[in-house]
Structure formats: structure tokens, C-alpha cells
Regions:
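Alpha-helical transmembrane segments and their helix-start/interface "positive-inside/aromatic belt" motifs
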Residues: 87-105
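Soluble N-terminal domains of membrane-associated systems
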Residues: 1-81
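Hydrophobic alpha-helical transmembrane segments and adjacent short intramembrane/lumenal linkers
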Residues: 195-302
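Small-polar-interrupted transmembrane alpha-helices in polytopic inner-membrane proteins
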Residues: 106-110, 165-168, 173, 180-203
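Interfacial loop/helix-cap signal at membrane boundaries in integral membrane proteins
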Residues: 123-168, 191, 199-201, 206
Length: 339
């Protein structure tokens, strides 16, 4: 085929490929294969022609776009954890503070009610649980509740259960926050009552070292899950410039991102509860010789608290000050401030 005829037959197609790129991966692959065929033909019969260089440039551009998209699939995970999630929390910092204060209030009510009437504890935690705990304390093994014959099975169960409870807290936001706040109320009262039992028995310091080795991640993650639920509620009640439906969908999307982040945190907390808390419990068990040093418990507790405060509070503020922000389309953008 003469070069002129070859160009006339394919020029419209090449122009289309060059000036109207497609986002459809199947279409992109088909275009690339077609161009490779055309390029092979051109190199065979018109090796020094300008049209050969033109086809090569179009094919190269498509190849680079395929490579870039493949690379972005991996960088997307990195961007999600390093920028998207922290900036998302910067957006909801006031809501996070409100949720934390509200949950703390519920815990305080649990403690105060227990001080005024110890029968309140049994009404919240149940007679069997309170009797078991008091029996363990009398036997010199106050934290025997954390001992398990099959720690791995317990680890899996607790991780799944905590994730499920957190998901219910998130979904509760759909009910104008009633479900979320009700879950916070129940968990706050239980925590306040449970913690008071040990303080009332003179085991306050020991209970902090044992319970909060895993509880720091677990409880604060439940607070964050409650925040995610209230994000949905906020989207329903305060749509701003968006329609209520669009605002609701955006709230759901943000809440699910938060939930994704919490799953690995719950897994770590469950690991701590079944292996580290167990060892800390042995530290204060009069009949056990194997336990974890007190300094190790303090270190784990401190690192857990530091991680939550840094990743969900301090780091988002730092990113915001550096000029990073989330655009309406969800993209991360760095705005360089003029000197």
C-alpha cells in the first residue's frame, strides 16, 4: 500500500486517539493494540517517514498512561493512609471532640451512679459478670476474666465483635444519630461501672495498666466510630450547599472511609487483649509467676495513646498548616501559600 493511501485510511483514527483519550481500560487496550499494528506496518514499509514517528508518539503516550494508571493503583493506598484519612479527620475535628466529650460524660454518669448505688452496677453489667469479677478479686486474680484457654480463637472473635459494634455505631447515624448515641450511652455506662469495680476494691492503678493496655485503642476507636456515625447524621441534618441526598451520600462515603481505618486498629487491640493484657493480668495474679513488667505495660499504653492523638489529631493539623486539603471531587491538593 502506498504511504498516501495508508495515511488517508487511518488519519482520522489517529487524530481521534491523539486528541480524544478514553478512560475506559478496554478501549485503551484496544487502541494500543491497533496502534502497535499500524506502527509495525509503518516501520516495515515507511521506516523514515514522519507518519511512522507520529504513530510512535501516539502509541507511546497511551503506553505511558497505562503504566501511570497501574502505578497509581499502588500509590492510591499510600495516599489514602498518608493524606486522605488525616485530612478527613481535620474536616471533622469539632465533631470528634464533641463525640469524645459526650462519651466521657456517659462514662462519668456510669461512675457517679455506681458510687451512689452499687446495685446500679449489677443492673448494667449483670449479676453473673459482677459475681465472677468479685470472685476473681477474692481469689487474688482480679483480671482473670481476660484469661482464655484458646487465645487465638478469642482474638478472632473479639476483633470481629468490636468491628461489628463499631459498624452498628456508624449505621446508627442514619437514624438521625439516635442509634449512635444510644450505643455510646450503653458502652459508656458499662465502661464506667466496670472501671469503678476495681477502683472501689483498691485496684485502680492495676486496672489501668491491665485494661487500658488494649482498651486505649479499643475504646478510642469506638469513639471514632461514633464520630463516623454522627458524620452521617450531620450530612442529613446540615446539607449546606448540597442537596440533602448528595450530602447524605457524602456522609456515608466519609463514614465508611473512617470505618476502613478502624478495622486494623481493632485487630491490634484484640491482639493486645488476648496476649498482652493476659500477661499484664498475670503480673497482678498472686498465684502466677509469669507476667509482663509494669514498665512494658506503661510503654504500650503510652504508645497506643500517642498514636491515636498523633494520627487523628496532631498530624491532620500539620497537613492542613502545610497547605494540604481535600477538594470537592475527593482529590488531595497542596496549596502553596505566597511568602
Amino acid at each position: 500500500m502506498r504511504e498516501g493511501m495508508f495515511i488517508k485510511k487511518n488519519v482520522d483514527k489517529w487524530n481521534e486517539y491523539q486528541h480524544n483519550p478514553t478512560s475506559d481500560p478496554d478501549e485503551t487496550a484496544e487502541r494500543f493494540i491497533t496502534l502497535v499494528d499500524d506502527l509495525s506496518y509503518a516501520k516495515t514499509f515507511y521506516p523514515r517517514s514522519k507518519v511512522t514517528r507520529w504513530i510512535n508518539s501516539i502509541a507511546s503516550a497511551i503506553y505511558l498512561s497505562i503504566y501511570k494508571n497501574k502505578k497509581e493503583k499502588y500509590s492510591r493506598v499510600f495516599t489514602f493512609w498518608k493524606y486522605e484519612v488525616p485530612l478527613l479527620f481535620k474536616k471533622y475535628h469539632r465533631l470528634l471532640l464533641f463525640t469524645f466529650l459526650l462519651f466521657s460524660l456517659f462514662v462519668g454518669i456510669g461512675v457517679f451512679s455506681s458510687i451512689k448505688d452499687e446495685s446500679f452496677i449489677r443492673g448494667i453489667l449483670g449479676d453473673s459478670y459482677v459475681d465472677m469479677t468479685e470472685d476473681n478479686i477474692s481469689k487474688g486474680d482480679p483480671f482473670g476474666v481476660y484469661k482464655s484457654d484458646n487465645p487465638f480463637t478469642n482474638f478472632v472473635y473479639i476483633a470481629m465483635n468490636n468491628s461489628f459494634v463499631a459498624l452498628l455505631m456508624v449505621i446508627g447515624g442514619v437514624l438521625i444519630g439516635i442509634g449512635t448515641i444510644w450505643a455510646m450511652w450503653n458502652n459508656g455506662l458499662m465502661l464506667g461501672c466496670f472501671q469503678y469495680i476495681f477502683f472501689a476494691k483498691g485496684l485502680g492503678f492495676q486496672s489501668i495498666l491491665v485494661i487500658w493496655v488494649h482498651g486505649t485503642l479499643e475504646i478510642l476507636s469506638l469513639v471514632i466510630a461514633s464520630t463516623a456515625g454522627l458524620v452521617i447524621t450531620q450530612g442529613i441534618l446540615f446539607p449546606g450547599t448540597y442537596s440533602r441526598l448528595v450530602s447524605f451520600k457524602r456522609g456515608i462515603k466519609d463514614a465508611m472511609k473512617i470505618m476502613i481505618v478502624l478495622v486494623p486498629v481493632f485487630i491490634i487491640a484484640s491482639f493486645f487483649e488476648n496476649y498482652v493484657t493476659y500477661l499484664m493480668g498475670n503480673t497482678f495474679d498472686k498465684q502466677s509467676s509469669g507476667g509482663l513488667p509494669v514498665w512494658a505495660g506503661i510503654l504500650i499504653l503510652t504508645l497506643s495513646l500517642s498514636f491515636i492523638i498523633w494520627y487523628f489529631v496532631i498530624y491532620p493539623i500539620q497537613l492542613h498548616k502545610e497547605g494540604y486539603h481535600i477538594q470537592k471531587n475527593g482529590a488531595i491538593k497542596l496549596t502553596v501559600k505566597p511568602i
